[in-house]
Design a protein with these regions (language model features):
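Small beta-barrel nucleic-acid-binding modules, principally OB-folds
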Residues: 1-14
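Serine endopeptidase catalytic core focused on the charge-relay Asp
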Residues: 9, 16-22, 37-40, 44, ...
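Short beta-strand scaffold segments in enzyme catalytic cores
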Residues: 23-27
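Generic, ordered loop/turn and secondary-structure boundary motif
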Residues: 28, 50-51
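Short beta-strand micro-motifs enriched in acidic
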Residues: 28-30, 84
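Structural signature of eukaryotic scaffold interfaces centered on beta-propeller domains
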Residues: 32-35
């Protein structure tokens, strides 16, 4: 059980968008199923943290893991899977690194 709690804690991210806005999100691993044959790693957050303007091609997103000990960046390009919905207040971005 402690392992599960540690894994959950390590999945929480701090996200900074190109406009300087800051929010939180989660690192998620989507397991293979009928429609994809490989695990898909994504950042999932709210649309009010990263909206359609923040996930346009060329935009940069910085996220921090492990209480800001590890910083990574995503530069949005055509090869990434992205999804956002204002109605459902969700944004998903594929991680390739």
């Amino acid at each position: 059980m402690i392992t599960g709690i540690k894994q959950m804690k390590n999945s929480i991210l701090k996200i900074k968008n190109a406009d300087g806005g800051i929010g939180t999100g989660f690192y998620c691993l989507i397991e293979p199923n009928n429609w994809n044959s490989f695990p898909l790693r994504v950042v999932m957050t709210n649309n009010h943290v990263l909206d359609e303007n923040n996930i346009k091609i060329g935009k940069k997103i910085i996220y921090s893991l492990n209480n800001n000990k590890i910083n990574k960046q995503i530069i949005i390009d055509e090869s990434r899977i992205t999804y956002t919905s204002k109605k459902y207040d969700i944004t998903i971005i594929e991680i390739k690194e």
